[in-house]
């Protein structure tokens, strides 16, 4: 068995005047390969510790949190990569509901604002709308986003303007539909982003690329949207 020390952000609005950091030592028996496994062990010791989790396999995005100063998924973070004390905090830039749980309302408001669905006014075919292999390949690196919010909550522009700046996750998905050969609303989507804040608050800091658990590149997608904006104004 190995003893590990966790420093966890704690805040219960029903009883705490302000947040605080709690230090907990726990014996791990070697079966806790991932951070989420260790968190489940911690919760068995102290049931009041609150965090989101679901699939355990990096698909749902529920257990995103700030791990030793960097956003990531607890279920994909190997305990062997975490040296010394493990500091866990909620995703930055969003209101804290309790402990490691944040209010995702603003994040999903911005995501929904880009109309994350195909817009095609032609008569629907009996089966699927076909794409060539080349057209389908254009969506690689775009559709895999799991909406964990690690990228947007690592972005200073989103911290400062969460009500105005769409954020890396939303803009990645905006380009996912702009790039889709089956979608017919490119002009409408670009019009929706024609604003000093919604798109152009991205200053290519690239924190989003650094933290994405799926290895996606929101900055590249945002750059392509900016390029399209420029080209249509020429």
Regions found by a protein language model. Give the residues of each.
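Short structural boundary motif marking the start of a folded domain
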Residues: 1-6
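Short polar catalytic/cofactor-binding loops
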Residues: 8-14
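Short, contiguous acidic and Ser/Thr-rich linear segments
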Residues: 22-33
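Short strand-turn-strand beta-turns centered on an Asx-Gly dipeptide
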Residues: 27, 66-70
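Ferredoxin-type iron-sulfur electron-transfer modules in oxidoreductases and energy-metabolism complexes
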Residues: 32-46, 89-234
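Active-site phosphate-binding and catalytic loops of NTP-dependent enzymes
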Residues: 46-52
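Short, structured protein-protein interaction patches enriched in aromatics and acidic/basic residues
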Residues: 55-64
């Amino acid at each position: 068995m190995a003893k590990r020390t966790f420093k966890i952000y704690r805040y219960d609005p029903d009883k705490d005047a302000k947040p605080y950091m709690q230090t907990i030592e726990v014996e791990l028996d070697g079966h806790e390969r991932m951070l989420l496994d260790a968190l489940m062990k911690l919760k068995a010791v102290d049931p009041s510790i609150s965090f989101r989790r679901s699939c355990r396999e990096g698909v749902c995005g529920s257990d995103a949190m700030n791990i030793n100063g960097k956003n990531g998924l607890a279920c994909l973070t190997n305990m062997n990569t975490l040296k010394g004390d493990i500091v866990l905090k909620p995703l930055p830039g969003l209101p804290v509901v309790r402990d490691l749980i944040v209010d995702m309302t603003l994040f999903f408001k911005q995501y929904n604002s880009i109309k994350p669905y195909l817009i095609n006014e032609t008569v629907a075919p009996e089966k699927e709308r076909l794409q060539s292999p080349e057209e389908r390949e254009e969506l690689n690196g775009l559709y895999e986003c799991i909406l964990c919010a690690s990228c947007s909550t690592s972005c200073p522009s989103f911290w400062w303007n969460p009500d105005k700046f769409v954020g890396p996750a939303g803009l990645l998905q905006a380009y996912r539909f702009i790039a889709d050969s089956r979608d017919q609303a490119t002009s409408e989507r670009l019009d929706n982003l024609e604003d000093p804040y919604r798109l152009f608050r991205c200053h290519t800091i690239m924190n989003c690329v650094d933290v994405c658990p799926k290895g996606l590149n929101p900055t590249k997608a945002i750059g392509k949207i900016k390029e399209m904006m420029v080209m249509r104004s020429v």
